[in-house]
Amino acid sequence: MMLDLQKIVKIFNEGTVDEAVLFDGFDFHVKQGEFVSVIGSNGSGKTTMLNLICGADAAQEGKILFRGQDITMLPELKRAKFIGRVFQDPKAGTCAGLTILENMALADNKQKHFGLGFAINKKRTDHYRALLEQCEMGLENRLNVKVGSLSGGQRQALALVIANMTDIELLILDEHTAALDPKSSETMMYLTDKLISQRGITTLMVTHNLRHAVEYGNRLVMMHEGNIVKDICGEQKRQAKVQDLLEVFNEISIENGNGV
């Protein structure tokens, strides 16, 4: 098992009148090579789960194992050696004031004791161009352009490439197409699928786009109020349709008095 969340308890505003229990003995497991699409309504626990995995947040109880090793107390920075993350906001994964080349060199030097200039040589520059060619956006010809001048789609594509530059073992995609226009969103998913397939990297993708959840990945998980209410893979995942997911969402809504 690559990732194993065991008996997680997560409470917000603990000990106050606003105390809210999200996870109460939550279990979640991911095998190596899985591409898991995670869906669910707002407040279902999707992003909190990602934050716990990456180390951006901590649970009150439970364990997080990565390849059998307990990483529950491991700081976020150290987890970044083997976990890459792309956020919803295209601005979050790159530095606007630096060029494309400088952003990639900075990522290339992550966890190393070298200056920025160490990575900027002809060999590395050619390597960066080759990585950017996969985006099919012409970014390989704009290495000296400031990232702040790129479109949202271009910047998110760069963030995805950067997240995959080092030897990460788990890729976290946190609604990484949500802030993009429809065309850029489709381009981003094409690039995402291509990069994941090429590397065979284990991936968790949180999305509100049900079609993307159905069309991409080999496993689909639906969350609701801190619980997994649907978990399918294999032939079930291949046969899944958007309408099936909508029906489950509606059943949940009816149970909570919000059905139509």
Residues covered by each model-derived region:
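The feature captures the beta-strand-to-loop junction immediately N-terminal to the Walker
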Residues: 39-41
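A short, flexible loop at the N-terminus of ABC-type nucleotide-binding domains that lies
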Residues: 2, 11-25, 75
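Conserved ABC transporter NBD signature motif
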Residues: 62-70, 230
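ABC ATPase NBD coupling module
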Residues: 70-84, 89-92, 114-117, 121, ...
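Conserved beta-strand-loop-alpha-helix hinge in the C-terminal portion
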Residues: 227-251
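H-loop/switch region of ABC-family ATPase nucleotide-binding domains
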Residues: 207-208
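Helix-to-loop junction immediately C-terminal to a conserved catalytic motif
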Residues: 54
